[in-house]
Amino acid sequence: METETEHDRTVSVDDNDSLVPEPSSTKESFFEDLSLTGQVMNPQLSSAGEVLTKVELDFAFVSEKLVNLSLLTMQLGTRENDFESFVSKKEEDEEEPSSNVDDDDDSAEKALEFDLLSSILNSEVKELESLLGFLQNEIQSARVMISPFQHDGEAFLDLEGKLNDTEQSLGQLMEQVVEMKKQSSNFQRLSSGLDEQGSWSGGQTSVSQNDGEFGDLSAKINMQTADQQRNVLRMLEKSLAKEMELEKKLSESRNTERELEMKLYSSEQDVVYMEEVTEDAFSRWLEADNAAEVFKGTSKEMSGKLQILQFNLSGSFKREDNLKSKLVDSKERLEAKECALHKLDSSNARLADFLVAQTEGLKESLQEAEEKLILLNTENSTLSEKVSSLEEQLNEYGIQTEDADATSGALITDLERINEELKDKLAKTEARAEETESKCKILEESKKELQDELGNFRDKGFTIHKLASLEKHLRDSDLQLEHAVAAVEASKEKQNLLYSTVSDMEDVIEDLKSKVLKAENRADITEEKLIMVSESNAEVNEELKFFKGRLKEGEKYLQQAEERKLRTAKDIGVHNKIMKKLVMQLAAERERLHKQITNLSRENCVLMVKLKKVGKTGYMESGNGSEVSPKSDQNASSCHQGSRLQATFISLTNPEEEETGSKSDIGSVRRLDVGALRFKHILVAILVILISSIAYVISQQNM
């Protein structure tokens, strides 16, 4: 029977180990705190929340154990009458010994069962009392932990409400434990009068039982013969061997249960990790979607700007085409004007050469005329002398005078003819001067026209080289005109008409110079404008290149975003498949565990039935009606094992069967099951799969 007491101790230790919550419960409480507050809590507040969740789980365990102990008290209440009848019979037997030994054995067996159950109830009540004291200390420590955070708002209020609820539930549980303790003390008071031999001593020979360690049942059975002792010892050995086998099986089942719990914990961790991965993938997908929308907006803006720039470029291209056409026209006109200028230059050179030749000819003719005048004067003087001599000789010679008159008349006619020739030459020179003046006027007008055309050409954007060549031509023409003016001034010294024409030519040349300067200024302005236009065109071209590059980058980013979308969609699909497989595996694992637990419970029931049958067969084999049967030992051990197995496996049975059983026995009793917590995980996984599939469908529709 020492093995039985050791078995009781192991069961109580396992029950105490079951008080410690699983790691997943703390994580669930932490996520619940996050969902309630909507923000990340302080680590001390979160640790206090974890303590409260542990306390709530321990409260659930205590309430469940109280329900089981209430069932035990009900059984003890039903057996109390049997115990009282046994006590009364013992007292009567002490006064008058009876001959019915079988009834005495049955009553002694029931009394021993009552004693064992009352001691079990007492030990369990003590354990619950110590556990409630520990939980009270935990609640006080949690209150001390959250007391510095009174100004944190909603988190503190939620934890304060949880603390108040736990204190209220603790008070209710303490009241129930006190009532249970009173009942167990009453039962212990009744069973304290039973001595070690199973006889009633009237309360004088009561032996205290320490922490669930009971006396040996073999010492409590009154054995009278050696055959009975041998049979009992054999039965005890068989029962001990079976009990050892059952303990081995139970330890193996516990090991398998722990392994399954570890597997469930690892699967829960995998599920949590997959949930985090799916959340990260979903957040990345949302970020990619937002980035794609931003890129779409920027691409639309860039496309609008590009359309505006293309419109401006088309306008600028049209303007450029117009300017090019105007440039071509102006080039053609300039070439025509250059041809005209070349012709004018050639004509000016010819005129200058002609004027130089004319001036030289005029100078030579004037010199000849002067020489002729000198000769004429000398001839006149000689003639006058001759006339005087002839007059003197006329007197002398009359015939000679007539001859002299004839010769003098001829000379006079010759002189008059020479004068007329000189006058004709002067008229010709005057006509030539007038022609030069008219040509100068024509040149002035042509220069004005050329200056205007040069200004127009410079406004239209001609090159500096052409303008420099034109200026050189103008300077050459100016020099030629100056030479002509110098020649005309030299001729004007002798003729006022030539002086007036030369002065007019100088005025015209000065006007032309001023106009040329103005034209040069205008040409510089037009060149600056052309430079500005070219710079603006270059800037526009650079902006076009930049925007084209930005467009290409935007298209690349859009392609990358679409590729990321496809990748994330594929990843989400793969994760969804993995999650579905995990959920199916979890469901299959849960069903397998449930089936295994039901099979174990059935095997335990079968073993209990077999034990009962073995006890009955042993009693039949004894064949001696006066001897005591080992049925009491087997029934006590089977009842004890059944109660312990019920306490260990009650948290793993089907929640619906437990609810129906508890309602039929006690009423409406609240129960917490591990399956309910697992069902939450399954629902969360299904919701995550639905959300990811909906997001994938929406993304495909948007694409």
Swiss-Prot record:
Expression sites (tissue/organ): Ubiquitous.
Top-level taxon in the UniProt lineage: Eukaryota
GO cellular component terms given for this protein: nuclear envelope; nuclear membrane
Localization per Swiss-Prot or TrEMBL: Nucleus envelope; Nucleus membrane
Biased composition (Polar residues): 198-208
InterPro entries per UniProt: WIT1/WIT2 (IPR039976)
Membrane topology: Single-pass membrane protein
Assembly information from the UniProt record: Homodimer. Component of Ran complexes at least composed of WIT1 or WIT2, RANGAP1 or RANGAP2, and WIP1 or WIP2 or WIP3. Interacts with WIP2, WPP1/MAF1, WPP2/MAF2, RANGAP1 and RANGAP2. Component of a ternary complex composed of WPP1, HSP70-1 and WIT1. Interacts with KAKU1. Interacts with WIP1.
PANTHER family (alphabetical): WPP DOMAIN-INTERACTING TAIL-ANCHORED PROTEIN 1 (PTHR35705:SF1)
Record's function text: Together with WIT2, required for the nuclear envelope docking of RANGAP proteins in root tips.
Name under which the protein is recorded: WPP domain-interacting tail-anchored protein 1
Organism: Arabidopsis thaliana
